Each structure stands twice: as structure tokens, then as C-alpha cells.
């Protein structure tokens, strides 16, 4: 979750479930609402602070922070929620899963701005044992896996999650050898030249 706190208390426990993709964006409809891959246990206050704000890096006007998670403004002045460091990768991979599993992009919530941050977090907070075990446990129930937990590198092979844009192509042609020299050849003899073309573009 967002705060990683241990609190001994009597009921009510101030504990609930966070929908990483805000359920208000898809009208609390199933199967999105109960898809465990984007559900995480959380402190009620932290869940309330997150509300349905997008994710990002809080760099100014931080009005709430506990356990490393923050509510504040990003570099564009947008109010966002930043999860603690050890949960950043979990958030990113659950969001990549959700937009892949449910490509409608409910509420237009998955933006290019968030995607850039998620790509960074996917590499910053790599898959650990707990996240991997969680993936295995959920797969037993839902009969499907989060591929971005099994293969985080898949993220780099997808050009855009937020749009339907395709990767632009750039030719980067290399020819070897750079120079070919032709010399004299006797009658009834022949000379062979090899020229290699390699396109290392995209």
C-alpha cells in the first residue's frame, strides 16, 4: 500500500482497499472493480488523500505525506499523488496491466504524462519477491497473469499505452565496405565483391 505502517488498534481498523485505477472512472463496474491486479490494501486516510488524482512526482505544495507517499503538485502545477518509492513499480505495472486488459481507457485516466512517469517507475522500482508471489497467487484465482510483472521489459517494447500511435520508422542504413575498388581481371577469370547493407533503425 501507500504508507507501510504497522498500527495496533481496536475496531474500526481504518483499513480498506485502494483501486489504483479509480473505480469512479469506470462506474464501479465489473470485472474492473474486483480485478485484484490493481487492488491494494491501504490506510483509509491515505486512500482518501489519493482520491482519484492521477499519479506523478510531487515537487511543490505538498499538503499531505506519510510513509513516503505525498499529495502535491507536479512540475506542471497539476495536483497529483505520488506513492512511496517501494510501491512505485507496483503502481506502474498495475496501470500498464489495466490499460492493456481494459483498453477503453476509462475516464481518459491514463494520460501520456502519467505514462512517462510509469515507464520511469517501472525501472526504478523493479519486481521483487512479494510482487512476484502476489502475481502467482492472483493468477490462481483469476486464471490470468500480469505480464508486466513477469516481463517488465515488455513495457519498453510497446511504443505507446496512452495512444494508438505506432512507432515512427527511422532508417539508419550502414553499408560495408565503405569503398569498393575494381581492378583489372584477366579473360576467363572473375572477381567477387561483397557489399553488406544493415538497417539498424526502427
What residue spans do the PLM features occupy?
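Hydrophobic residues on conserved beta-strands that form the core of alpha/beta folds
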Residues: 17, 175-177, 192
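Surface-exposed binding patches on compact interaction domains or structured appendages
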Residues: 170-181, 201-202
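Hydrophobic beta-strand positions in extracellular immunoglobulin-like domains
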Residues: 45, 196-197
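Compositionally biased, intrinsically disordered low-complexity segments enriched
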Residues: 21, 195-196
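Domain-level detector of nuclease and nuclease-like folds
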Residues: 3-167
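Short, solvent-exposed loop/turn segments enriched in Ser/Thr/Gly
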Residues: 186-195
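Aromatic-residue hotspot detector
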Residues: 55, 148, 177-178, 182-187
